[in-house]
Amino acid sequence: MLQARIEEKQKEYELICKLRDSSNDMVQQIETLAAKLETLTDGSEAVATVLNNWPSIFESIQIASQHSGALVRIPPSTSNTNASATEQGDVEEV
């Protein structure tokens, strides 16, 4: 009778060990899933930022296509009045 009880407890112990191992595997899978979800969240934020920029891009394209003039750089000169303008990279509309 005592031997049967010991065998029963050993089987119970083996099952508990399997349950512990399964629980550890589950914890690792959940942690991996959490990391993947974090990556997905970061990617979603990047996509949202890009999508939020499109109206500005379209507006810039529209403004550029409506503008008939061209922008050119002012050539450098030796006079002091033009030197400060060219150092700052000013442009002149033609």
UniProtKB/Swiss-Prot annotation:
It is found in: Nucleus; Cytoplasm, Cytoskeleton, Spindle; Chromosome, Centromere, Kinetochore; Cytoplasm, Cytoskeleton. Residues 18-38 form a coiled coil. Keywords: Cell cycle, Cell division, Centromere, Chromosome, Chromosome partition, Coiled coil, Cytoplasm, Cytoskeleton, Kinetochore, Microtubule, Mitosis, Nucleus. Disruption phenotype: Condensed chromosomes with long mitotic spindles and without sister-chromatid separation. Sensitive to cold, thiabendazole and osmotic stress. Residues 72-94 are annotated as: Disordered. Component of the DASH complex consisting of ask1, dad1, dad2, dad3, dad4, dam1, duo1, dad5, spc19 and spc34, with a stoichiometry of one copy of each subunit per complex. Multiple DASH complexes oligomerize to form a ring that encircles spindle microtubules and organizes the rod-like NDC80 complexes of the outer kinetochore. DASH complex oligomerization strengthens microtubule attachments. On cytoplasmic microtubules, DASH complexes appear to form patches instead of rings. This is DASH complex subunit dad2.
